[in-house]
């Protein structure tokens, strides 16, 4: 086992996922959803706590897994969850109920993110999590940066694409989009950007405005 593999295994096995999130994960997998890993979940919870987030948007519910992690870090926040799959939103509602999240802390919007995001108020949110339609990830991140206030954060899990992004031979549409997103955000004066290798990877962007 390589050092990287050993580190990844240690991180994966050291994270204790709360029971409500573990149940939501099991249900998500039954539905064919692809929830974020516990490693990424724990990381976004820490980021939500560190920012003191009060208003969060997630694009793609993961049947409730990502939302529960975000609210674990920022229980004071109101979460807006957007998904085109009614069944996934229903599962998220049930997961939030099981976790005793107050109904006032979450709102669920059924629809295509490409249709919903342009209607949302700019500079009104602390965090936007992008975890849907990877072929549209660049557009969604642009919307996310419009929606967050200065100092707000846009988070993109799965950014390493299962190792494909680091392999220059891989040139499929999704891998190329992830690779371009990482490169463009590193060069942008509008954001501070970093990539974490935890779980399936997490791109973290902080809006700082044009210099």
Question: Which stretches of residues belong to each language-model region?
Answer:
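A short alpha-helical cap/connector motif
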Residues: 1-127, 134-155, 159-211
């Amino acid at each position: 086992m390589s050092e990287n593999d050993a580190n990844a295994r240690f991180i994966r096995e050291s994270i204790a996922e709360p029971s409500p999130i573990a149940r939501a994960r099991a249900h998500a997998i039954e539905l064919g959803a692809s929830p974020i890993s516990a490693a990424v979940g724990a990381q976004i919870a820490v980021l939500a706590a560190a920012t003191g987030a009060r208003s969060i948007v997630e694009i793609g519910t993961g049947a409730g897994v990502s939302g529960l992690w975000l609210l674990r870090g920022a229980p004071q926040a109101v979460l807006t969850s957007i998904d085109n799959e009614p069944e996934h939103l229903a599962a998220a509602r049930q997961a939030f109920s099981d976790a005793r999240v107050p109904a006032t802390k979450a709102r669920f919007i059924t629809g295509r993110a490409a249709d919903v995001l342009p209607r949302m108020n700019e500079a009104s949110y602390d965090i936007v999590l992008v975890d849907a339609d990877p072929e549209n990830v660049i557009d969604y991140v642009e919307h996310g940066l419009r929606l967050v206030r200065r100092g707000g954060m846009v988070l993109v899990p799965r950014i390493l694409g299962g190792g494909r992004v680091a392999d220059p031979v891989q040139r499929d549409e999704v891998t190329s989009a992830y690779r371009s997103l990482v490169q463009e955000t590193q060069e942008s004066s509008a954001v501070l950007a970093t990539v974490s290798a935890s779980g399936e990877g997490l791109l973290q962007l902080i809006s700082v405005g044009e210099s």
